[in-house]
Amino acid sequence: MTKQTIIAAIAFLASYSLQAQKHVYEDLLVLYVDEKYEKCMEKALTYTEGDATKKDPLPFLYVSMCNYEMSKLEKYAADYPKASRDALKWAEKYRKKDKEKEFFGNYEDYWASLNTMAAESGENLIDDPKGLSKAKATFDAMTGYYPENPGAWMMLAIVQYKSNLAKEGDLSMTSFDKAIAAAGDISTLPPDQKKLLKNALIRYADLQVAKGDRAKARRYAEIGKDVFMEEPDFKGMWDSL
């Protein structure tokens, strides 16, 4: 597929939503598709500060996407050491601008990639007492840009409980309960969200067992038993309850 075809396809997907904004950010799209991430980000940042464009969601999203792409490339590591963190930060800012999710669904592939990166980063930190603060920031950001993702809420609650923030953990579990109810059939969740949910259910069960509340561990584990029982780590947890 040629670059021109890719640009046309992406522009078509977003065309209905773009009509609602004063500015059509074809300049950002072209730079992004051409992999000129630094230039694209710098230009998007000017839009986020301009009086006529600072309320538009898309420039904030482009800043996030460019940071994400730069976080994967060694040539940007020295100048942008916090690119992965900034990708999450700007994704949150984008979502605050796009409260009605006018553009959100056009970027499902990006959300899956960002979720995967964030979840792996957060889980790598969650078992290290020195990493809890960063893990908390990561999962908090995930719930900020994608509050419909139930596993992110449960992971955030787990980190908060581990950090002796019981009240905050309880609030996050309330948000998890709402998100899981709204999700409906969890087998239809995107793969990245299913994986995070499975891992969160296992960790939450382990946490409750350590507290001596095996009944609560089993009650929440039941959420995933019809979907995850074929996976050894989940089955091992279930059999231990």
What are these regions (language model features)?
Residues 52-54, 99, 146-148, 181, ...:
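Short coil turns that delineate tetratricopeptide repeat
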Residues 22-26, 55-73, 99-127, 150-158, ...:
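Amphipathic alpha-helical repeat scaffolds of TPR domains
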Residues 1-29:
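Bacterial Sec-dependent N-terminal signal peptides
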Residues 81-143:
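Surface-exposed, polar helix/loop patches in the mature regions of secreted/periplasmic/lumenal proteins
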Residues 47, 94, 142, 176-179, ...:
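Canonical positions in the second alpha-helix
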Residues 192-196, 200-241:
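Terminal, low-structured helical/coil segments at or just beyond the last alpha-helical repeat
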Residues 28-32, 70-87, 118-133, 161-172, ...:
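Short coil/turn connectors between adjacent alpha-helices in alpha-solenoid helical repeat scaffolds
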Residues 21-85:
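Start-of-domain marker
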